[in-house]
């Protein structure tokens, strides 16, 4: 698998409150961003993989919903996570 438990713990430790903080919005957004970048690379090689294309679209939408939630709740945390991850907005 492209993402093992140690890599997940590293992502959660960097963007969450602790290594076991899997529920914070920032940690979830960071994990989705990692998965989106991996699937984007896969789609560059396999253009006709429509199930992966659908999964990628769903992940982007889920990340967008989390970003909208964070923007409504705490704009400073939203701006910091967008800047750290290098997202467009």
UniProtKB/Swiss-Prot annotation:
Pfam families: Ribosomal_S15
Keywords (A to Z) from UniProt: Ribonucleoprotein, Ribosomal protein, RNA-binding, rRNA-binding
Superkingdom: Bacteria
GO molecular function: rRNA binding; structural constituent of ribosome
InterPro entries: Ribosomal_uS15, Ribosomal_uS15_bac-type, uS15_NS1_RNA-bd_sf
Keyword Ribosomal protein applies: yes
Gene3D superfamilies with a match to the protein in the record: 6.10.250.3130, S15/NS1, RNA-binding
GO cellular component: cytosolic small ribosomal subunit
Entry's Gene Ontology BP terms: translation
Subunit details: Part of the 30S ribosomal subunit. Forms a bridge to the 50S subunit in the 70S ribosome, contacting the 23S rRNA.
Family listed: Belongs to the universal ribosomal protein uS15 family.
Role according to the record: One of the primary rRNA binding proteins, it binds directly to 16S rRNA where it helps nucleate assembly of the platform of the 30S subunit by binding and bridging several RNA helices of the 16S rRNA.
Protein name listed in UniProt: Small ribosomal subunit protein uS15
Source organism of this protein record: Bacteroides thetaiotaomicron (strain ATCC 29148 / DSM 2079 / JCM 5827 / CCUG 10774 / NCTC 10582 / VPI-5482 / E50)
Gene: rpsO
């Amino acid at each position: 698998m492209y993402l093992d438990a140690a890599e997940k713990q590293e992502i959660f430790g960097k963007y969450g409150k602790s290594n076991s903080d899997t529920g914070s919005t920032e940690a979830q957004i960071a994990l989705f961003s990692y998965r989106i970048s991996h699937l984007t690379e896969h789609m560059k090689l396999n253009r006709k993989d429509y199930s992966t294309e659908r999964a990628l679209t769903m992940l982007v939408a889920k990340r967008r919903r989390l970003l909208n939630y964070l923007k409504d709740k705490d704009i400073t945390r939203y701006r910091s996570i967008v800047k750290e991850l290098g997202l467009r907005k």
